[in-house]
Amino acid sequence: CIKPADIDGDGDMDFVLGNFGLNSKIQATAEKPAYLHVGDFDKNGAVEQIISCVTEDGNTYPMVLKGEMQRALPMIKKKFIKYKDYANQTFDDLFSQEQRDGSIERQITTTQSSFLINDGKGNFSLQALPYQAQFSPIKGIQAGDFNKDGKLDILLAGNFFDSLPEWGRFDANYGLLLEGQGKGKFAVKLSKQTGFKTLGQVRNMALVKGGKSTYVVLAKNDDKAQVFKF
């Protein structure tokens, strides 16, 4: 998710970028990117999506276990009878160029949630959010002066449960406040410090004005909305 806000207080528009975070098997960098491959690799009319990552040896390996891969692509079961035979296969070993023809490949070089800072001259730079914001995917962001000290604060929430069993649930975000200190600096305040505590899968966050109060409304996947008063 993306939220525009003047993060550093210099009068131009910056952005808060919610991303997948760093608490997962996907550790993408410019030197070792991660890829999403989308295509009909066995030419049966069904489209498959495969995530792969570059590892320390410089090769690109699929981030999919053999059982899951062969359910989508039965040819894998025939080609690699044993799990140990599949274990060390790179993406190029598994799929020939002919099988990859017509597929779409997209690359990412970071999964960090970040600030995108505008220098006012048409240039932008990424600054990673504090490590506490990297524990789980960020799906909801709001910016405002929530503690009424005249400085911009940022609320973050998210999580994602619908992952494969071997990946586990991404549920380590209970609600986070980045308390503004001015000039783009923020202090991390956990839910136990602020009372802004939310469980489940937040998918959006909205500010609602009511009288003299501001309410933060959290929309959740397969759950009722949650409301906080500031």
What are these regions (language model features)?
Residues 1-230:
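Beta-propeller-forming repeat regions
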